[in-house]
């Protein structure tokens, strides 16, 4: 017998939609208002800078031809499927894990859309200190990192007792 979806972690899928809207909206604004390589200072140590990433994090495999586009798309789809299954198997009350999974799925889907639609991922956040610049990234990357950090954090938190779970 199947369980009602609202009692599962899938109840948190609305957060995937929020992440997607914010991520794709920010990328749309960059594509409409910036030429490749344009930079606008926001705050000291933070710029908006339009860059294209043909690889993965830190432009990993960016210069490997075109096969990595499909490789990373396959990884994103696989991760999304696994996390959706994990959300379905978890209770809606397991908030931290479900929020983490939703953030990762939303970020992965945002970058997957870019990869499939444009052939590259749109990056725009440039953090720097002095002359040192961190790799340019986007809001999808931020959601993925926050989700991963929440999963690690959850591993350090005390587990609820059987009484608290009931």
From Swiss-Prot:
Look up the EC number in the record and give it.
3.4.23.36
| Subcellular localization(s) per the UniProt record | Cell inner membrane
* Keyword line: Aspartyl protease, Cell inner membrane, Cell membrane, Hydrolase, Membrane, Protease, Transmembrane, Transmembrane helix
Q: Where are the transmembrane segments?
A: 12-32, 70-90, 102-122, 137-157
GO MF term list: aspartic-type endopeptidase activity
The question of whether Cytoplasm is a record keyword is answered with no
Its UniProt pathway annotation is: Protein modification; lipoprotein biosynthesis (signal peptide cleavage)
Catalysed transformations (reactions)? Release of signal peptides from bacterial membrane prolipoproteins. Hydrolyzes -Xaa-Yaa-Zaa-|-(S,diacylglyceryl)Cys-, in which Xaa is hydrophobic (preferably Leu), and Yaa (Ala or Ser) and Zaa (Gly or Ala) have small, neutral side chains
One annotated GO biological process:
proteolysis
Give the active-site positions.
Answer: 123, 141
Which PROSITE patterns is this protein grouped with? SPASE_II
* Broadest EC class assigned to this enzyme: hydrolase
Q: Show the GO cellular component annotation of the record.
A: plasma membrane
Query: Which Pfam families does its entry note?
Result: Peptidase_A8
Question: Mainly resides where?
Answer: membrane
State the annotated membrane topology for this chain. Answer: Multi-pass membrane protein
Q: What does this protein do?
A: This protein specifically catalyzes the removal of signal peptides from prolipoproteins.
Family per record: Belongs to the peptidase A8 family.
PANTHER family, per the entry: LIPOPROTEIN SIGNAL PEPTIDASE (PTHR33695:SF1)
- Protein name from the UniProt record: Lipoprotein signal peptidase
Which organism does this sequence originate in?
A: Salmonella typhi
Gene label? lspA
């Amino acid at each position: 017998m199947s369980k009602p979806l609202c009692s599962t972690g899938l109840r948190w899928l609305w957060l995937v939609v929020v992440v997607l809207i914010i991520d794709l909206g920010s990328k749309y604004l960059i594509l409409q208002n910036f030429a490749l390589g344009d930079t606008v200072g926001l705050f000291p140590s933070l710029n908006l800078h339009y860059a294209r990433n043909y690889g993965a994090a830190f432009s990993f495999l960016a210069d490997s031809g075109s096969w990595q586009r499909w490789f990373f798309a396959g990884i994103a789809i696989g991760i999304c499927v696994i996390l959706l299954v994990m959300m379905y198997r978890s209770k809606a009350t397991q908030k931290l894990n479900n929020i983490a999974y939703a953030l990762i799925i939303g970020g992965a889907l945002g970058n997957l859309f870019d990869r499939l639609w444009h052939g590259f991922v749109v990056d725009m956040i440039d953090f720097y200190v002095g002359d040192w610049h961190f790799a340019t990234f986007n809001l999808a990357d931020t959601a993925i990192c926050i989700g991963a950090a929440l999963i690690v954090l959850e591993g350090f938190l005390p587990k609820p007792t059987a009484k608290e779970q009931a």
